[in-house]
Amino acid sequence: LPAAYGLARHPGWLSRLLEEFISLPLAVPGLALALALLQLYGSMKGFRASWAFILVGHVLYTLPFMVRSILAVLAAMDLKTLEEGAASLGASPWQRFRDIVVPNAMPGILAGALTVVTLSIGEFNLTWMLHTPYLKTLPVGLADSYASMRLEIASAYTLVFFVMIVPLLMAMQWASARAQRITQ
């Protein structure tokens, strides 16, 4: 939210450049991103063996989707006028952000969050490169089960995948329809 807010609040060549920089992971395959992370942080054994390492990879991979989702909602409203109105009533910058920006950006936050979670659950290449034997995510466990011909375990992984993804996709559709109704 802060990145999208900053980009929406201060348009110009610098914000366009920052937006392109934030969108860079869209042009880089997950495998290349994982290799870069391994090159940078692979020697840090404590960090490399923790779940935070995979989390950093997923945040970098999905950040553009979240920022663009929120930015689209913020760009559709007259943010400057809303903030000036709140400031004229004595609201501090923090109050304006909390009480004006966040509620108005909520459809974008919700749509972005659902998109990010759905992408993150299904991302295999990045996670496969970053995981350790003690840290397996759902896609890696599913692939390992099929590779070792443990079809009963693979079936259980598939069922868990299905139970997680279908409600998320339904929530994304609902959030998208709700956001369209709100903006019209």
Regions found by a protein language model. Give the residues of each.
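Membrane-helix interface segments
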Residues: 9-18, 46-51, 81, 93, ...
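A structural signal for multi-pass alpha-helical bundles of membrane permease subunits
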Residues: 34-45, 114-120, 172-175
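Loop-to-helix entry region at the N-terminal start of transmembrane alpha-helices
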Residues: 42-65, 108, 113
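Transmembrane alpha-helices
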Residues: 60, 67-71, 79, 93-122
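C-terminal transmembrane helix and the adjacent membrane-cytosol boundary/short C-terminal tail
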Residues: 71-83, 87, 93-101, 155-184
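Interhelical loop and adjacent transmembrane-helix boundary motif
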Residues: 121, 127-171, 175-178
